[in-house]
Design a protein with these regions (language model features):
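Hydrophobic beta-strand anchors of alpha/beta hydrolase catalytic cores
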Residues: 80-81, 111, 158
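Active-site acidic short loop of glycosyltransferases
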Residues: 75-77, 107, 133-134
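Hydrophobic membrane-insertion alpha-helices, especially the h-region
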Residues: 13-25
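N-terminal Sec-pathway targeting helices
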Residues: 4-16
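Structural microenvironment flanking redox-active thiols in thiol-disulfide oxidoreductases
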Residues: 92-131, 141-148
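Short active-site neighborhood of thiol/selenol oxidoreductases, capturing the structured segment around
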Residues: 70-92
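N-proximal helix/coil linker or "cap" segments that precede and/or mark the start of modular domains
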Residues: 25-58
Length: 193
């Protein structure tokens, strides 16, 4: 019986030691890794803030008027890049909200509305005209740009890019950009006034 008690005591000591080491390891890893920025307004608005910033994939796309627009030309200014589609009802509802949201903010933020079905230029133009969109609408005829941003299956998706051209977060699905949380989130992320 005494031998069984000793085995049990040794086993409990080993389990306790392993548990202690595991806790210490997890705490050290948490301290060494960059933490995700806390932002109550971004959380309530539904922004997925990226744990690690990464360089926003470059693009040069034609606008509806045929002018090539290059993302790198806007470096130094935070940007919202929204992927949308003409067949997407949520996208069509979000476009006028984004347009209204942009009023008075274009000096602080760059806005890009990328139509993923850009080969349907007439349909894109019709939606833009109906909603009186003045923001740059870019035509995406190749999936390369979507793949680089990881846009698959669900639109609208809006990517938040900081002044240095780094991706800092994104939203998936329609958002109410007219909400106070939207502007509060962007002010926090991009240090805007």
């Amino acid at each position: 019986m005494e031998a069984g008690m000793k085995k049990r005591s040794v086993l409990l000591s080993i389990i306790g030691g392993v548990t202690t080491l595991l806790i210490l390891f997890l705490q050290a890893g948490r301290a060494a890794s960059p933490s995700q920025p806390e932002s109550p307004s971004c959380n309530s608005f539904g922004v997925q803030i990226f744990q690690q910033k990464k360089e926003a994939p470059a693009f040069t796309l034609n606008s509806l008027v045929g002018k090539p627009i290059n993302l790198s030309d806007y470096k130094g200014k935070p940007a919202l890049v929204t992927f949308w589609a003409t067949w997407c009802e949520s996208c069509r509802e979000e476009l006028p909200i984004l347009e209204k949201f942009s009023i008075g903010k274009k000096d602080q933020l760059a806005f890009f509305l990328i139509a993923i079905d850009g080969e349907r230029k007439k349909t894109v133009q019709k939606i833009v005209d109906q909603n009186k969109i003045t923001l740059p609408v870019l035509l995406l005829c190749k999936e390369k740009c979507m793949d680089q941003y990881g846009v698959r299956g669900w639109v609208p998706q809006t990517f938040l890019i900081d002044r240095e051209g780094m991706l800092v977060g994104k939203t998936v699905g329609e958002r109410d950009w007219s909400s106070p949380e939207a502007w509060s989130c962007l002010k926090e992320l991009f240090n805007l006034r």
